[in-house]
């Protein structure tokens, strides 16, 4: 049957999150995290999705009343998992290129608190051709500055109406880059010292590091999945079980975003840098170590390399005896992360080609 709010129950929750991006990653990572927070804590929030470019999936989302399923596949502490969960956190999805008034009105909603984005690595960029009166500005930071300025004016600079901003773009210190770009727009558009002070004191832009492999729409399994669900869901998104979100922000922000109370792997830390280094060393490092050896041995899939009698032992030894020694984080934390990495490499559902590394 069709998937919409008539055929599937959908809770009505306050709109507190604006999300720039409607792609597979945000829907299988951030929206899945918010779903779990709604289920297990008093977070009680829904998401308004904003399509960051003029072409996207907003119409498809709205056709299904913004409902879709996440299919998690992989090993969890050695156990095989293949689960399907209906995600109901998106209240509506907007295209600012055709619905700019509705987009700007989001700034007028007093209960709005968070902005989350994934607009690709190229998304956080300054475009000097953007104008304040553009409907909307072409760049993501331009749109965000328009929204923030409208909120500032709507609430007469009320410091309690600031927004907490979590960029998820795959750029090291993405929050710093986004903040820098917003300052460039404040200057370009002459938005004034009062607004600049409000932005600095009432809002927070925090660097984050995201980690979850999201293969996306399960083309080869979709018929079986629809049969199992009994819904015609054209927005199913597949992801691995492992998830990690490191947010460089103070603990009072963690209180407002209580992911830890939902048992999620979301960390609020004073510095993202050691976690970035850990990921590069213990995830990308072993990939680099195993790929030439596996390739020359005629082993084509990462999982098969890890299960190979010689290559598997070699990778394990390099990870635990050499790479780990270079990192300045608690040993038990590093060992857990390394074991999670090996479990991810062994995921029976993901055929990760050695040559793609």
Predicted regions and their residues:
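Substrate/ligand-engaging "lid" and interaction regions
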Residues: 1-357
